[in-house]
Curated annotation (Swiss-Prot):
Induction: By 4-NP. This is 4-nitrophenol 4-monooxygenase/4-nitrocatechol 2-monooxygenase, reductase component. It comes from the Bacteria. Keywords: Aromatic hydrocarbons catabolism, Monooxygenase, NAD, Oxidoreductase. It comes from Rhodococcus opacus (Nocardia opaca). The gene is npcB. SUPFAM superfamilies: FMN-binding split barrel (SSF50475). Involved in the degradation of para-nitrophenol (4-NP). Catalyzes both the initial hydroxylation of 4-NP to produce 4-nitrocatechol (4-NCA) and the subsequent oxidative release of the nitro group from 4-NCA to produce 2-hydroxy-1,4-benzoquinone. It can also use 4-nitroresorcinol as substrate with a rate of nitrite release similar to that observed with the two physiological substrates, 4-PN and 4-NCA. PANTHER family: FLAVIN REDUCTASE, FLAVIN-DEPENDENT MONOOXYGENASE, REDUCTASE SUBUNIT HSAB. InterPro entries: Flavin_Rdtase-like_dom, NADH-dep_flavin_reductase, Split_barrel_FMN-bd. It is an enzyme of class 1 (oxidoreductase). Pathway: Aromatic compound metabolism; Xenobiotic degradation. GO terms for biological process: catabolic process. The lineage of its organism: Bacteria, Bacillati, Actinomycetota, Actinomycetes, Mycobacteriales. Belongs to the non-flavoprotein flavin reductase family. It catalyses: 4-nitrophenol + NADH + O2 + H(+) = 4-nitrocatechol + NAD(+) + H2O; 4-nitrocatechol + NADPH + O2 = 2-hydroxy-1,4-benzoquinone + nitrite + NADP(+) + H2O; 4-nitrocatechol + NADH + O2 = 2-hydroxy-1,4-benzoquinone + nitrite + NAD(+) + H2O.
Length: 185
């Protein structure tokens, strides 16, 4: 008779499909991370982006090491995070498609630190300060050197599908700018 693994107090390897299923329950925003190297623009749809701290302003971005965008960032040492609006799912699909002519018919501002998508909801221009390998991906730690936000709602990603964010009308919690603490409404 087989013993229950929980009774043995031994962690079993997690199945890749189950891991992806569980992590897929975490909703995230959708970004296109862009970079340029030797005058060639690169870009990829990335949801593994998070703020790290505000003093100095820093972010973490995780990219698959097989992506051309990954190689461009490693060489250029800077990139732009383009935060997509709720009406930009087709743009996210384009930049997620291998081999696609990603920048065709896309308004782009070519900047010193790489391309910035003109129609993005918001953007953060970043300078890499550190990076480390994490399995198939590389984690870039970067300082934000420029940022701007427009108006509108973000594109969201949840359980393998794009969607949009709908705030609660009578939210019980909000963040105050005075103390940056979450407090009751």
């Amino acid at each position: 008779m087989l013993e229950d693994p929980m009774k043995q107090n031994v962690l079993q390897p997690l199945d890749k499909a189950e891991f992806r299923n569980v992590v897929g329950h975490f909703a995230s925003g959708v970004t296109i991370v862009t970079a340029a190297h030797d005058g060639v623009p690169y870009g990829a749809t990335i949801s593994a982006v998070t703020s790290l701290c505000d003093t100095p302003p820093m972010v973490l971005v995780c990219l698959n090491q097989k992506l051309g965008t990954h190689a461009a960032i490693r060489k250029a040492r800077h990139f732009t995070i383009n935060i997509l609006g709720e009406d930009q799912a087709s743009l996210a699909h384009t930049f997620a498609t291998p081999g696609a002519d990603k920048f065709a018919d896309v308004a782009v501002h070519h900047r010193q630190h790489g391309p910035r998508l003109a129609e993005a909801l918001a953007y953060l221009t970043c300078r890499v300060v550190d990076d480390l390998e994490g399995g198939t991906h590389r984690i870039f730690v970067a300082e934000v050197v420029e940022a701007q936000a427009g108006t509108g709602n973000p594109l969201s990603y949840y359980r393998g599908r794009f969607g949009h964010f709908v705030p609660y009308r009578n939210a019980m919690w909000r963040t105050t700018q005075a103390d940056n603490a979450v407090s009751p409404h």
